[in-house]
A protein has these predicted regions:
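Flexible, low-complexity linker/boundary loops enriched in proline and small hydrophobic residues
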Residues: 1-25, 141
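Hydrophobic beta-strand-centered segment that forms part of the acyl-chain substrate-binding groove
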Residues: 2, 69-107, 134-141
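Beta-strand-rich interaction surfaces with strong enrichment in secreted/lumenal proteins
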Residues: 9, 52, 94-96
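Catalytic strand-loop segment that frames the active site of acyl-thioester-processing enzymes
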Residues: 16-56
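Hydrophobic/aromatic beta-strand elements that line small-molecule binding cavities or substrate pockets
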Residues: 22-23, 90-92, 122-124
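HotDog/MaoC-like acyl-thioester-processing domains
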Residues: 29-30, 98-102, 107-146
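Compact, glycine-rich, soluble single-domain proteins
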Residues: 47-73, 86
């Protein structure tokens, strides 16, 4: 995408404390997106997961990946004003623990998209695009009227 990238909060319906994408780093509407999530340690889930050894829950990594995928979907003109929901999650693998102070690089490549559903593959890496793989998964989106 040419020009400045939009802010995730201007595209996604999610809000604090459930908005997990701080900024976009790449966007090809309807095709792919990448962004970052900086984990300060002040997030709501760290005190209870796990006391004395705070670790990002794996399902929240998948949610963060899905939010980046939702940005790729929602910036496609066919889906403007729609709401992409999780339709499924396949082949999720968790390779590294993510802890306070880490920055996740989140990226998604969309596959087939119909007018009501689509697929994508995503991953979360610690530290940047060339960082350590923390999570990978395949996503199924269902798109409904917003």
């Amino acid at each position: 995408m040419n020009g400045p990238l939009p802010r995730p909060i201007d595209i996604l319906p999610h809000r604090d404390p459930f908005l997990f994408v701080d900024e976009l780093t790449r966007l090809e509407p309807g095709q792919s997106a990448a962004g970052t999530w900086r984990l300060s340690g002040d997030e709501f889930f760290f005190p209870g997961h796990f006391p004395g050894r705070p670790t990002l829950p794996g399902v929240l990594m998948c949610e963060a990946i899905a939010q980046v995928g939702a940005i790729a979907v929602l910036t496609d003109q066919r889906f403007a004003g729609k709401l992409p929901l999780f339709g499924g999650l396949d082949r999720a693998r968790f390779r590294r623990q993510v802890v306070p102070g880490d920055t996740l690089w989140l990226e998604v490549e969309l596959g087939r998209m119909s007018s009501r559903a689509g697929k994508g593959s995503g991953q979360a890496l610690i530290g940047g695009a060339d960082g350590d793989l923390a999570c990978s998964c395949d996503l199924l989106f269902v798109v409904v009227d917003g």
